[in-house]
């Protein structure tokens, strides 16, 4: 549970990405250009656990629905837009944990924040303070 705190203290932030994703590559290039210290994690090969997702969701203050990659083929093929409203929080967390491609990316996880998706102004405000 506290491994992310350790990552922050030792190696900067936790950056979750899918290398084939153009937005993730753009975000990573920006992080490197700004000399932001982070640990990289492939979101599909080392997918987030239910516990991690619950912790990040609570830390973010965002609705859980925002954690879904609504642009992804898997999300669309599973017709999740129609199904999520009928699912409990626990069911949604289990679903997110089942496949990293369902999770919105990239993510940057800090001790007291979660950045979801690459929004330059938000990233500058949080990471360059």
For each of these PLM feature ranges, what is it?
Residues 7-34, 38-41:
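Local sequence-structure signature of Cys/Sec-based thiol-disulfide redox active-site neighborhoods
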Residues 45-129:
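Thiol/selenol-based redox catalytic cores and closely related redox-interacting motifs
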